[in-house]
């Protein structure tokens, strides 16, 4: 697990339904922590729980992005024969021929793509290739914000230092700190 790459997800019932549809909910379920609401930590030290719903089952779930990704990748590779490549980058993409020029840690090579699912992030070569192509015409706006991942460890006895079943938020003007619980008693925090 790379530092700064494990920001937790807050998963709604739609995400749960997608996991059930994919047949992997039972693998993910032990990783989920229900959060009944948003716990605001105000400047004066007061705390205010804002429930997500009126019923007990109206919750969202905290789940480790890293652990969820491991399950999704393993399922895609083993169950659906998907070939996932890490540490590869796209050098160019020809929209007419659907040909990708790729770079791996070992060599540069070309791929003919019948279909392509891209997750190459900010500065995407694929997005740029479609920049003036109808009907897609994507746009890109790099935000001036950044983030830092932090951790609140579990107590010595393994218990949570904060309320377990809440998404904790410290709103501070242009900055915000959020904390989501993990099954191990710690919290993953993100400072935006």
Identify the residue ranges that each predicted region occupies.
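N-terminal Rossmann-like FAD-binding beta1-loop-alpha1 element of flavoenzymes
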Residues: 1
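Conserved FAD-binding catalytic core of PHBH/FMO-like flavoproteins
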Residues: 74, 88-92, 97-192
């Amino acid at each position: 697990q790379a530092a700064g790459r494990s920001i937790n997800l807050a998963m709604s019932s739609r995400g749960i339904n997608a996991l059930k549809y994919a047949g992997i909910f039972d693998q993910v379920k032990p990783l989920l922590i229900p959060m009944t609401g948003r716990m605001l930590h105000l400047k004066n030290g007061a705390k205010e729980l804002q429930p997500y719903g009126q019923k007990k089952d109206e919750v969202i779930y905290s789940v480790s992005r890293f652990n969820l990704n491991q399950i999704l990748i393993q399922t895609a590779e083993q169950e659906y024969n998907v070939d996932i490549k890490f540490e590869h980058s796209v050098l160019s993409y020809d929209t007419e021929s659907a040909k990708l020029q790729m770079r791996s840690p070992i060599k540069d090579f070309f791929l003919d793509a019948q279909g392509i699912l891209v997750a190459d992030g900010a500065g995407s070569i694929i997005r740029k290739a479609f920049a003036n192509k109808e009907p897609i015409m994507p746009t890109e706006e790099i935000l001036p914000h950044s983030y830092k991942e932090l951790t609140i460890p579990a107590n010595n006895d393994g218990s949570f230092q904060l309320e377990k079943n809440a998404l904790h938020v410290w709103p501070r003007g242009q900055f915000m700190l959020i904390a989501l619980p993990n099954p191990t008693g710690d919290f993953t925090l993100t400072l935006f």
